[in-house]
């Protein structure tokens, strides 16, 4: 169990550092709402502050409620991830890495909420006429982690059949 736990902690730590570094860089080098085209018509770096969650969920709720809600949900999720990892002595890389990604992403956004009362987003994608809401490294880590967990569950379900 030691090696998977060390890998989990290193992965989560590196992703959290990358998330916080990129947010710090964008916040210190861009004006709020400033946008830099990277791939014209497809991908921009745009400095946004999001008081809500994905797609602006709870953005209009009072600051105290948002803070308590998002902090509680994040800490409960983090506790459940760590409990699951340790109790089940998870050693499968298809579980260790995705769980580390989800934890790091959740913690990265929690750090922003505690520091600023909102999350720094800056990855801005357009697909044709569709504009995806801006997101960050933490959101990406959570999405990739969940995707890998779902793929792993589907594969394990197929093996049982």
Curated annotation (Swiss-Prot):
GO terms for biological process: proteolysis. It is a multi-pass membrane protein. This is Lipoprotein signal peptidase. The keyword rRNA-binding does not apply. PROSITE patterns: SPASE_II. InterPro entries: Peptidase_A8. The chain crosses the membrane at residues 6-26, 67-87, 90-110, 134-154. GO terms for cellular component: plasma membrane. It comes from Syntrophus aciditrophicus (strain SB). It is found in: Cell inner membrane. The gene is lspA.
